[in-house]
Amino acid sequence: MRPQDLTVVRFGYPGSPHNPALAHWLRHLAEQGYDVRDAHFDFRVDLVRNREAGRFIEESDADAILMIDGDMVPLDDTGAVLSAPGPLVFCRHVSQLGKEIEWQNQGIPTGCVRIARRVFERLDEPWFVYETDATIRLVTCCEAATFTKKCVAAGFNPKPAGRIGHLLRMVAMPPGPGHQAPEYDFEWKILHQKGLL
């Protein structure tokens, strides 16, 4: 996708650690001429995603927006999200629990997703919505899942293209007595040895 056809928005969380790998990747995109912006999840994620999608529609002439969360770590094949065909393209990644997101059931992973302008123009606002229980204490459906449902109902089929890492804070330890180690379906990569962090 040509730089003038894509707006890139990095979504940061207050107090998040610096992510040098993502900063380097975004700087490289900016040097190529892509419009790279910052947004902050200073309140509900669905509201911030809607705000930035609205800004994109109102302030940009680009054909698509790439939404990328500040805790994503670009890999060798992450750039596929920039050029893969389709109006709704995303990178596969794991959730904060370390499991790959089953996008057909849970909604597309919005940590790194390219969305064409025409998707927003065809869907009714709000595009991203948390569904909650009656007490508004429990999220019953995240903004990624509700957005995916709307897209599929409007005839847009999400397409995976490439992978992206998810920077997770965690403590690794062996299982306790009488417990078995859990099975995980993701790769480990020591990023500082590759010069990424």
Spans of features found by a protein language model:
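A short, glycine-/small-residue-rich helix N-cap motif at loop->alpha-helix starts
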Residues: F43-V48, T140-C141
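Alpha-helical elements of Rossmann-like donor-binding domains used by nucleotide-donor carbohydrate transfer enzymes
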Residues: H24-W25, R51, A80, T146
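Short, high-confidence coil segments that cap the C-terminus of an alpha-helix
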Residues: D61-A62, P85-P87, F156
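Conserved catalytic core of nucleotide-sugar-dependent glycosyltransferases
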Residues: A53, M72-T135
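Short beta-strand-to-loop acidic/aromatic patch adjacent to the donor-nucleotide binding site
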Residues: D61-V73
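Active-site nucleotide-sugar/metal-binding loop of Leloir-type enzymes
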Residues: N50-A64
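C-terminal catalytic/acceptor-binding lobe
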Residues: V129-L197
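N-proximal low-complexity "stem/linker" segments adjacent to membrane-targeting elements
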Residues: M1-H40
